[in-house]
Amino acid sequence: MTERPEPDEVITCGQVTLRRYREDDLDALLQAVTESLDHLRPWMPWAANYTRQSAAEFLARSARDWADGSEYNYAIITDGALAGGCSLMARIGPGGLEIGYWVHRACTRRGLATAASAALVEQAFRLPGVDRVEIIHDELNVASGRVPRKLGFTEVGRQPLSEPTPGGNGVGVVWRLTRLQSGSVGRHGIRAG
């Protein structure tokens, strides 16, 4: 039986380490989200009524999704602490993966989401059959839009968001990077391990 290729479980990227979520991340995840609710709620529908049970369900779902290849969720670790999360998600059709990210309110404007996304781009294009990566965000979430722009993604359209955000207008900005364009993503000191 041939194993399905998957991204690395641990990736070091400059000032951050991306690490596949584990069950023992429960307390750190809950704390990071809870401390950042005012920052996350406008843009992340899942943060609306976040509880310990929400965190536990997310971690259990993350393990299942990783196993079936539908989603690869990582904790963003910096200075020894969980500072956010990022994902590669197989929900934009054949040949594509979507990147999602969030960071703790105290960790914004430090380049963590950009570094994490650069690492995920590299991982995505190591997987067979992936020819494009997309980032989709509400058009009013200007901070989120800076990430794909810095990484050389191209805005390819606007569409209604499947899950509108409380702070947004429901219009999703779609950014795309193709395998051929991926050389434009800086190295950011990425090491798999």
Place the predicted regions along the sequence by residue.
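Conserved GNAT-fold acetyl-CoA-binding loop/helix
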Residues: 41-60
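A short helix-loop-beta-strand connector motif used in the catalytic cores of GNAT acetyltransferases and
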Residues: 60-75
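Acyl-donor (CoA/ACP) binding surface of acyl/acetyltransferases
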Residues: 1-28, 32-39, 73-193
